[in-house]
């Protein structure tokens, strides 16, 4: 019996999201031009700080993260939590193998650039909690499993990100006889940044879902409220990138080879982690949908959080922040390509694709079981 083929990934995106790589490139170009053409802009933006954190960057990050976290169904954890193979494998990939791989790649490719190396290590610690939902839907992954893994990663990041940053930037390099991060690195600063930039939108998203469903019902919340706030995630992302590139424009233009060197380990990281997730899911017989979810939640990184931590800890014009800024430029095209790779790999999984249960980017309550 011939099975239906899933629709092309590009056809499953809304108009603005379909052109996301282009919007990101335009935001970067706009930021670079503004930084070069408007005298004193970088100084003015850098002066807008609260508690040592850039106010424009903070606003952009919070606006971007809230809509995505408001989509998560925090109460539906039972069935997925009972899938021990998925949960254990996800935890190992996300919190053991992926940070260790990024640590190794950062030292292999950037041994002479400590600021960029530190930025990449921070990126490796920030597990994706935003765009992964889109990649998962495009690849026909398990939406509820993605929601659970995103929620768990969100909570785990609030609790453990600071300690892991301290371990990979100070403890492990010391054990291996490598140079450690400068004394300016602060475990407290990392933890505060995570609590502010992840904890606030996480709490706001959870409270919004509880209050929205209780007052107006799930149909209204998912069919009306979420579509209204959804575009603001893109606006916040583009605003943040534009501001960062306005601040970093001189460095980007002056050091294109450094930017290229930052990009290389990121590409290797995405490909290796995604392949590991798909292979482990196939070996463990998780089924295609949950395997795709496992691979994308492991491969994607929360560059928004990494940028926030780098900016809050090392400064808005630091090399660490630049390493985080390069992230979205590399992540978006690579993960779009991996969506196609996942759909191609679908033929190697026993469960046939079913259009009746394929996820959509803008689900309503009636689409849910």
Each model region followed by its residue ranges:
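Alpha-helical transmembrane segments of multi-pass small-molecule/ion transporters
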Residues: 1-70, 75-298, 303-369
